[in-house]
């Protein structure tokens, strides 16, 4: 969705007469074929770096903008630079991508530089999971679990001791605690997970245009049940400046926040790519 929105916004912008948009995807994506000037079906992202470089050279591309899983392309930055191709992957450097994509490492780095993170425990087996749940239930009124690696909230659950087992089939984000422990114990191999307090406060999403660790523009979308509010000034913007600088963010990215019980904003994650809803703010003219 965001790739189509980026193309549409470019075609509607003042740059439309001076740029040619070439899009590629590992899937057919007919909507991209409609809006882009040219579309190519690319190999799976893990094997696409050489193919993308060849296409950029063939079509005389000046700038390559990558979306999801861009860390596979970031590893080849030097090769693109040698061919005078500007590479936009969401962050500069493989180490920065590794830190952003590992939610535990990301939290540790936020804590180290004094930013408002959400405390968490990393677990790698059933015994560690049960111990972490017991520890965090003693500290916080509500807890949740999410995988160390993942996108789009896949695998996230709020854990409740009294939730009916069938609740998981009605509301996928709520799971009985014992049921989750039992299901996790059946994984082979186990998946690294985080246990952390569940924050039920307001959530916001900051859409950011940045260049080599410096913010060029940002706007916050505060999420309500049936609508979103766009703010040109927001308390999270100062935090975003620190995050963008520390992780050397570059391009169009998104940073998620949520309020704790004291209404303080806490960092959820950095998405080194445009959020699915970033086009909701296009009426502001900011991004």
Label each residue range with its predicted role.
Residues 1-93:
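ATP-binding N-terminal substructure of ATP-dependent carboxylate-amine bond-forming enzymes
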Residues 60, 84, 114, 140-141, ...:
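Residue-level detector of structured alpha->beta connecting loops
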Residues 97-192, 212:
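Active-site nucleotide/adenylate-binding loops and adjacent lid/helix of ATP-dependent enzymes
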Residues 153, 222-229, 271-284:
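Glycine-rich phosphate/pyrophosphate-binding beta-alpha loops
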Residues 169-243, 247, 258-266:
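Phosphate-binding site of ATP-dependent enzymes
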Residues 235-261, 272-287:
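Active-site "cap" helix and flanking loop/linker of ATP-utilizing ligase/carboxylase catalytic domains
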């Amino acid at each position: 969705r965001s790739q189509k929105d980026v193309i549409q916004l470019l075609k509607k912008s003042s740059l439309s007469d001076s740029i040619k948009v070439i899009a590629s995807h590992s899937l057919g994506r007919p909507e991209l074929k409609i809006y882009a000037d040219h579309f190519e079906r690319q190999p799976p992202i893990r094997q696409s770096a050489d193919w993308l470089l060849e296409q950029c050279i063939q079509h005389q591309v000046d700038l390559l903008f990558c979306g999801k899983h861009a860390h596979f392309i970031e590893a080849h930055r030097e090769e693109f630079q040698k061919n005078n191709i500007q590479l936009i992957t969401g962050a500069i450097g493989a180490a920065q991508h590794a830190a952003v994509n590992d939610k535990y490492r990301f939290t540790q780095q936020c804590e180290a530089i004094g930013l408002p993170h959400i405390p968490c425990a990393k677990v790698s087996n059933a015994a560690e999971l049960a111990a972490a749940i017991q520890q965090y239930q003693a500290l916080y009124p509500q807890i949740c679990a999410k995988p160390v690696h993942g996108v789009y909230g896949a695998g996230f659950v709020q854990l409740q001791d009294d939730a009916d087992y069938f609740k998981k089939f009605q509301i996928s984000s709520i799971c009985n605690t014992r049921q989750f422990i039992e299901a996790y114990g059946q994984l082979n191999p186990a998946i690294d997970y985080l246990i952390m307090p569940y924050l039920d406060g307001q959530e916001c999403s900051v859409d950011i245009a940045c260049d080599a660790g410096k913010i060029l523009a940002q706007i916050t979308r505060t999420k309500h049940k049936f609508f979103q509010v766009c703010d040109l000034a927001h308390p999270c913007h100062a935090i975003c400046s620190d995050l963008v600088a520390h992780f050397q963010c570059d391009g169009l990215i998104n940073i998620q926040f949520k309020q704790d019980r004291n209404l303080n904003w806490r960092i959820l994650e950095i998405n080194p790519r445009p959020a699915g809803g970033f086009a909701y703010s296009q009426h502001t003219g900011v991004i």
